[in-house]
């Protein structure tokens, strides 16, 4: 049964938080990230470079710290490991999540990279709509990023997402020239949220490294790059903020 009149607006944020280390002052201040995210009032948050057990970061468990401070459900997968500690991708959600999956995007000997997927159960009227979200962090080399996105769009997890199912893909694509969307994501019917916007470095953004893309029964209502005082200093990237209308049809 369809419910054409029912819809729900959700806010999605994507942000490489640089392990809670400021991009200009080099200060480790998790509270700045928490305060910034709280001000955004997002329903779904895609974070990259979330650290655990790193001595130079007081050995903090940023996964627990952030999720508890914001009162959100969380899913996490470690990516890059050090001798002591590691960091990875995290999805925070105000709504319950299920079907947490990981796609390995590591290419050869290069740094471990991946995509974290979750099904978020968004309330729409008296019903729940499954919104499939993917959080990516791609590599630094151009050829590496191309292979990673080719693997991602061809992976089984994505193939099983129906064309009408709300699908959101976001993260740090390290997209220096803004070319990855047109080459790999738009052919899969994934539209960029908003226009191409610079997000790095945070103090004076010159490169459009980050992006949010979407398809299915979801409509973009608003898009912006975080420009508050905290958004400019809390990390070395600026956050992306997108409001979507999710419908049952």
Where does each model-flagged region fall?
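Active-site neighborhood of divalent metal-dependent phosphoester/pyrophosphate hydrolases
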Residues: 22, 48-56
